[in-house]
Regions:
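Acetyl-CoA-dependent GNAT
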Residues: 3-74, 78-91, 139-143, 149-167
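Conserved GNAT acetyl-CoA-binding A-motif
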Residues: 88-99, 110, 122
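Short glycine/proline-centered loop/turn elements that form peptide/ligand docking sites
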Residues: 81, 104-107, 124-129
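Conserved catalytic-core motifs of GNAT/GCN5-like acyltransferases
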Residues: 97-99, 117-134, 146-147
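Residue-level recognition of the GNAT/N-acetyltransferase active site
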Residues: 68, 72, 101-103, 128
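Conserved active-site tyrosine of GNAT-family acetyltransferases
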Residues: 111, 116, 136
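Conserved beta-strand edge residues that scaffold enzyme active sites
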Residues: 23, 27, 102, 125-126
Length: 167
């Protein structure tokens, strides 16, 4: 993901998040540090989703996963998360974490397929409505079973949903 993708990513965020990151903040996240990794998914030559990972010590923090409403349900989120997981393995990370709205059952289900498990709650985390965030972790990133689980989730998704042209 690079400078050329920023406007498409910003447009997706504005469609799916109540309080999206600003273009400037997003640019800083994408281009700012060697400890931040962002990927995009494309279908039909257009950006339809993106995801970000921040590395802190030996852990990865999934900072965002967003899919255009017109592409939701096609397995794009699964493919994006899988790419972040692969990156975490290649960086020799040992764990990954994320926050998800407590009410976002589709996302929670996806994260569970990858081995993320609830470990706590951040009360009132989302400022738009005071909703709690569920904190989820996966601690076996360095174990070969982790990437096997990721690839199995991707294979199932491709078989049932298709997915984007590429991530």
């Amino acid at each position: 993901m690079g400078e050329a993708d920023i406007h498409a990513v910003t447009a997706i965020d504005e469609m799916v998040f109540v309080r999206p990151w600003s273009t400037g903040f997003l640019r800083d996240q994408i281009l700012g540090a060697d400890t931040r990794f962002h990927v995009v998914a494309e279908a039909g030559g257009e950006v339809v989703g993106h995801a970000g990972l921040a590395v802190v010590a030996d852990e990865g923090h999934v900072t965002t996963v967003a899919v255009s409403p017109t592409a939701q349900g096609a397995g794009i989120g699964c493919l994006l998360l899988a790419e972040l997981c692969r990156r975490s393995v290649s960086l020799d990370l040992v764990a990954m974490t994320l926050e998800v709205r407590a009410s976002n059952m589709p996302a929670r289900g996806l994260y569970a397929r990858f081995g993320f498990a609830p470990s706590g709650v951040r009360p009132g985390y989302y400022s738009d409505n005071g909703e709690d965030a569920l904190v989820m972790w996966v601690h076996d990133v360095a174990d070969p079973s982790f990437i096997e689980r990721v690839e199995a989730a991707c294979a199932t998704t491709r078989a049932t949903c298709g997915g984007g042209d590429h991530v």
